[in-house]
Amino acid sequence: MHSVMSMLYYTLIIAFLIGTQAAPKSEDNGPLEYPAEHSLPSTQQSNGQHIAKAAPQTTHGRFAWMPDGTEDLNIAMDQNFFKKKRFRSSRVLFSTQPPPVSRKGQSTGFLSSAVSLNRTARTKRTAHPVLHRGEFSVCDSVSMWVGDKTTATDIKGKEVTVLGEVNINNNVFKQYFFETKCRDPRPVSSGCRGIDAKHWNSYCTTTHTFVKALTMEGKQAAWRFIRIDTACVCVLSRKSGRP
């Protein structure tokens, strides 16, 4: 009887140790779209402004924000937070004023470092070279900074609310997204420009990619991958009855 109890005792100890080792040990087990727990610091009220206060992080890496009774939720963040490469995207910009846009909607780059938090260069990223004789784009696209995005689809296909503004060093920074989309699905009557309409059906369509952006879900704010428009491409299909 004594030996049976001893074996049962050791069995329970081994089962406990196995269960302990199987438990998550760090924040790395959280979903990819959420930052580490030290990414969003606790906020404080300053200069009489009402700023939301961060609650402890949940097990899924989300950050709960408790409004202080004001209607407008003002999220405060540390400027050094944006220096983390994993949260940086060349298509996402936090700025106190609209980014400059050159003629035909082409971006001329980020604002100066005193105004813009993103240091990734985007100088004329979407500017096309001067077209010589006989050189034309298959599809016409338009690029612009979008600063009024309120909702978006995340990487899981769920609709989320995009965080419009954040408070950094008592300055309100707006979240902008650099998007590219088709100007016209059919730049010519037959579809895409330069395509043999005798053998092919064609049309221009906008394609998407996912970028990390600050979003809100209820009273929780976190980084998530959201879908934005990034290019205009030509879609081809062979006409039926032709080899």
Curated annotation (Swiss-Prot):
Gene Ontology annotations of biological process type: cell surface receptor protein tyrosine kinase signaling pathway; modulation of chemical synaptic transmission; negative regulation of neuron apoptotic process; nerve development; nerve growth factor signaling pathway; neuron projection morphogenesis
GO MF, one term, reads: growth factor activity
Q: Name one Pfam family in it.
A: NGF
Q: Which domain of life is it from?
A: Eukaryota
Renumbered residue ranges of the record's region Disordered? 26-50
State what changing residue 200 to F does. Answer: Diminishes receptor binding
Keywords attached to this Swiss-Prot or TrEMBL record, sorted alphabetically, are: Cleavage on pair of basic residues, Disulfide bond, Growth factor, Secreted, Signal
Q: List the disulfide bonds.
A: 139-204, 182-232, 192-234
Impact upon substituting residue 224 to G: Impairs receptor binding
Where can this protein be found?
A: Secreted
Using the record, list the residue span of the signal peptide; answer none if the entry has no such feature.
Answer: 1-22
Which InterPro entries does this one have? Cystine-knot_cytokine (IPR029034), Nerve_growth_factor-like (IPR020408), Nerve_growth_factor-rel (IPR002072), Nerve_growth_factor_bsu (IPR020425), Nerve_growth_factor_CS (IPR019846)
Q: Where is the composition biased (Polar residues)?
A: 40-49
What do the Gene Ontology cellular component annotations say?
A: axon; dendrite; extracellular space; synaptic vesicle
Look up what happens after changing residue 145 to F: Diminishes receptor binding
Pro-peptide region(s): 23-125
What family, per the record? Answer: Belongs to the NGF-beta family.
Q: Subunit composition?
A: Homodimer.
Task: Quote the function comment for this protein.
Answer: Nerve growth factor is important for the development and maintenance of the sympathetic and sensory nervous systems. Extracellular ligand for the NTRK1 and NGFR receptors, activates cellular signaling cascades through those receptor tyrosine kinase to regulate neuronal proliferation, differentiation and survival.
Give the protein's recorded name: Beta-nerve growth factor
**Which source organism?**
Gallus gallus (Chicken)
Q: Which gene encodes it?
A: NGF
